[in-house]
């Protein structure tokens, strides 16, 4: 279990995160959702260890990691821009981290991930030859071969089109279930968060607005911000889609 206890973070005298407390269960998919500037990326960086915690504590399976360096936490991230090496092919990118830790994944385990993520036919391609969805899968595979204790994903679907987006969502779910891997995702899109996650953490102005299962958030929003930020967006999207089909029926 990952426990965040009364986390506070400020930059230049501005409070970015204010008294954040929550638990994330082993194997759970949790999305951190909020508008731009809400503090969600800062929270992800605090968990990863890129950014120091000012006040409060971060505990993983009973061990206090608050002052533990990023390299010793065992958490891995897939960045929004994938951060792949353009001079290497897909397979070389996937296995790059094993140069420093050669025994962490066996050849069979690497092959299993390649099959799971549908990358077999793309292994010899350079990164520039891959589509956005293929790059995302390579980045996922590269992270997974390092056997992270927690998988962090920063806006993993933002640059993908609809069909590819659904495919990547399914693969993220499969990875979390197959490996019983705690997965934390940052997103600004309510639909992504609600359809991908076991629970959703909604942040507004550095504070927790609501933390619960998707159905709880939809059916029992805690405050007006939840209704306006989430439910209104979903309602607008639904009405737009409905109007398109209505136009098609009357054309």
Where are the predicted features?
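Conserved ABC ATPase "signature" region
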Residues: 105-122, 173-174
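A short, proline-enriched helix->beta-strand linker immediately N-terminal to the Walker B motif
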Residues: 145-149
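Conserved ABC ATPase signature
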Residues: 126-130, 134
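The feature captures the beta-strand-to-loop junction immediately N-terminal to the Walker
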Residues: 33-35
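ABC ATPase "signature
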Residues: 211-212, 220
């Amino acid at each position: 279990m990952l426990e965040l206890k009364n986390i506070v973070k400020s930059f230049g005298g501005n409070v970015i995160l204010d008294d954040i407390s929550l638990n994330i269960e082993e194997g759970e998919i949790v999305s951190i959702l909020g508008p731009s500037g809400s503090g969600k990326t800062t929270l992800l960086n605090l968990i990863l260890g890129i950014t120091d915690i000012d006040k409060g504590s971060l505990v993983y399976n009973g061990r206090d990691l608050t002052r533990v360096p990023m390299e010793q936490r065992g958490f891995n991230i897939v960045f929004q821009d994938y951060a792949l090496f353009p001079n290497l092919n897909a397979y070389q990118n996937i296995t790059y981290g094993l140069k420093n830790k050669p025994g962490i994944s066996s050849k069979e385990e690497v092959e299993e991930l390649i099959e799971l993520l549908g990358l077999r036919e793309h292994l010899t391609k350079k990164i520039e030859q891959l589509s956005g969805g293929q790059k995302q899968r390579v980045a996922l595979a590269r992270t997974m071969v390092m056997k992270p204790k927690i998988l962090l994903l920063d806006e993993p679907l933002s640059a993908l089109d609809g069909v590819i987006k659904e495919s990547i969502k399914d693969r993220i779910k499969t990875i979390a279930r197959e490996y019983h891997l705690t997965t934390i995702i940052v997103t600004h899109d309510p639909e992504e968060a609600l359809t991908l996650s076991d629970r959703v953490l909604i942040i507004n102005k550095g504070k927790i607005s609501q933390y619960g299962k998707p159905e709880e958030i939809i059916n029992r929003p805690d405050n007006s911000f939840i209704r306006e930020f989430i439910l209104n967006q979903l309602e607008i999207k639904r009405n737009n889609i409905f109007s398109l089909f209505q136009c098609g029926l009357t054309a």
